[in-house]
C-alpha cells in the first residue's frame, strides 16, 4: 500500500538532506510513499507566509505522519521557534531520540552506547511564559502539570516495554525546584507501580552529566523534562559522533513528526556538502512507526555498511565526499543489501513484504 507523508524540507541545508532522504526511502520502499511537500520557517517567511503556515499544519493533521529538515529560529527575535510551535499545535508531547554508537563511525567518543532519551515536549521552560517584571528584571515560568507528567511517564514506560528496554532513569533537579520536579517524580513513581518488571532509578541532573561523561554505556533509557531533555540529548549525540548521526521523533495522539535534530548550517547551504545521515535515520524511525520494519532494517543496514566502508563520507564524518556522492554510495549499499537478502546479484529493493492494512500508526 501507499503512504502519504508530509515533507517539510526545511531551511539552510534542509532541502539538500531532504532530497537525499527521499531518494533512500523511495529505494527501500519501492516508491510507495506519496510525499506532500510544504514550507515552514524562514523559507515560508521569504514567500510572504507565516513561519508555520496553516497549510503545513493541515497537511500533517491530514496525513498524520511528517518528516522535516532543520528549521531556522532567529536568536534575537523575529518569530518563536517553529519547532516549539509545531509540537504545541499538534500536541506532540513526547520527543524521542535514540542515541547509538554506529559501526564504522570513527568520530564516536564511546562505543557500546545504546540509549533512548524521552523528553516531555510541551511545557516546562518551553511554555513560552516570560515577561519583564520591571526594567532590567525578566521572569520566565517553568510550567509542570500532573496531566502532562503522567502522559509522558505512561508513554516512556510503554515505549520501554515495546522496545525491549530494561531500565529507566528518571532525571530531575528536585533539590532546586522541589515543587515542579517532585510533581514530575510523583507521576513517575505512580507509573512505576504498574511496571514492576523494570529497573527504575531517580537521578539528579548533575549526577547524570557526570555519569554520561565517565560511562554513558550504563544508561538504557533516560526520561526527563523539556529543557533538561533538550540539553542532554545534544550532549549524548556528541558521545556517538555528533548531531549528524542521531535521529529524532516527536509523537502525539495518532500523529508523529520525524526530524533531523541538527541545525540549518547556513554556511554550507546550497553547496552540496551537508551530511544527510541524521534525517535518513529519522526516516528509519518513521518506517518503523508505520509498521514497515523490513524497509527500516534495509535502510539501517545500508547506512551501517556505508559507515563501515568509510569511502564516501562527508567532511563532518571524516571523509571528503559531498552530499550527492554520499547518497549515491548509500544507494549502492542498499542495492547490495537487497541482493544479499535475495541470495542473488544486487538489484533494486522491491519494498517490504509486511503491509499495514491502513495508514493508521
Placement of each model-derived feature along the sequence:
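Buried hydrophobic packing segments
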Residues: 21, 25, 188, 279-287, ...
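Buried hydrophobic positions in well-ordered alpha/beta secondary-structure cores of metabolic enzymes
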Residues: 11-14, 64, 118, 156, ...
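Glycine-rich phosphate/nucleotide-binding loop
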Residues: 42-45, 211-314
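N-terminal glycine-rich phosphate/adenylate-binding segment common to multiple enzyme folds
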Residues: 45-139, 227
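Glycine-rich phosphate/diphosphate-binding loop of Rossmann-like nucleotide-binding domains
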Residues: 6-28, 134-206, 218
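Extreme N-terminal starter segment of soluble prokaryotic enzymes
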Residues: 1-5
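N-terminal beta-loop-helix "entrance" segment that forms/cooperates
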Residues: 32-55, 210-212
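Glycine-rich phosphate/pyrophosphate-binding loop and the adjoining helix
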Residues: 128-133, 137-170, 174-177, 195, ...
Amino acid at each position: 500500500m501507499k503512504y502519504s507523508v508530509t515533507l517539510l524540507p526545511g531551511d539552510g541545508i534542509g532541502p539538500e538532506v531532504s532530497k537525499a532522504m527521499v531518494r533512500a526511502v523511495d529505494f527501500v520502499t519501492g516508491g510507495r510513499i506519496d510525499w506532500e511537500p510544504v514550507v515552514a520557517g524562514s523559507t515560508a517567511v521569504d514567500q510572504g507566509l507565516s513561519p508555520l503556515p496553516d497549510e503545513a499544519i493541515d497537511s500533517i493533521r491530514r496525513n498524520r505522519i511528517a518528516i522535516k529538515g532543520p528549521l531556522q529560529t532567529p536568536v534575537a527575535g523575529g518569530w518563536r521557534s517553529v519547532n516549539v510551535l509545531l509540537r504545541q499545535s499538534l500536541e506532540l508531547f513526547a520527543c524521542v531520540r535514540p542515541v547509538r554508537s554506529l559501526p564504522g563511525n570513527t568520530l564516536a567518543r564511546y562505543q557500546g552506547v545504546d540509549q533512548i532519551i524521552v523528553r516531555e515536549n510541551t511545557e516546562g521552560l518551553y511554555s513560552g511564559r516570560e515577561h519583564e517584571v520591571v526594567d532590567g528584571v525578566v521572569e520566565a515560568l517553568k510550567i509542570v502539570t500532573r496531566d502532562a507528567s503522567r502522559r509522558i511517564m505512561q508513554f516512556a514506560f510503554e515505549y520501554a516495554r515495546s522496545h525491549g528496554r530494561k531500565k529507566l532513569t528518571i532525571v530531575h533537579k528536585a533539590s532546586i525546584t522541589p515543587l515542579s520536579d517532585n510533581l514530575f517524580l510523583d507521576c513517575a513513581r505512580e507509573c512505576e507501580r504498574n511496571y514492576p518488571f523494570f529497573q527504575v532509578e531517580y537521578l539528579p541532573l548533575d549526577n547524570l552529566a557526570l555519569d554520561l561523561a565517565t560511562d554513558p554505556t550504563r544508561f538504557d533509557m533516560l526520561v526527563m523534562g523539556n529543557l533538561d531533555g533538550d540539553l542532554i540529548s545534544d550532549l549524548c549525540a556528541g558521545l556517538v559522533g555528533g548531531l549528524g548521526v542521531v535521529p529524532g521523533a516527536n509523537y502525539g495522539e495518532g500523529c508523529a513528526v520525524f526530524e533531523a535534530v541538527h541545525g540549518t548550517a547556513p554556511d554550507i547551504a546550497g553547496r552540496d556538502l551537508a551530511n544527510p545521515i541524521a534525517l535518513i535515520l529519522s526516516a528509519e524511525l518513521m518506517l518503523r512507526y508505520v509498521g514497515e520494519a523490513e524497509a527500516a532494517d534495509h535502510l539501517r543496514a545500508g547506512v551501517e555498511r556505508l559507515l563501515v566502508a568509510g569511502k564516501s563520507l562527508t567532511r563532518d564524518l571524516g571523509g571528503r565526499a559531498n552530499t550527492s556522492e554520499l547518497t549515491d554510495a548509500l544507494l549502492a549499499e542498499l542495492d547490495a543489501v537487497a541482493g544479499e537478502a535475495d541470495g542473488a546479484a544486487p538489484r533494486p529493493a522491491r519494498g517490504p513484504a509486511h503491509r499495514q492494512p491502513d495508514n493508521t500508526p
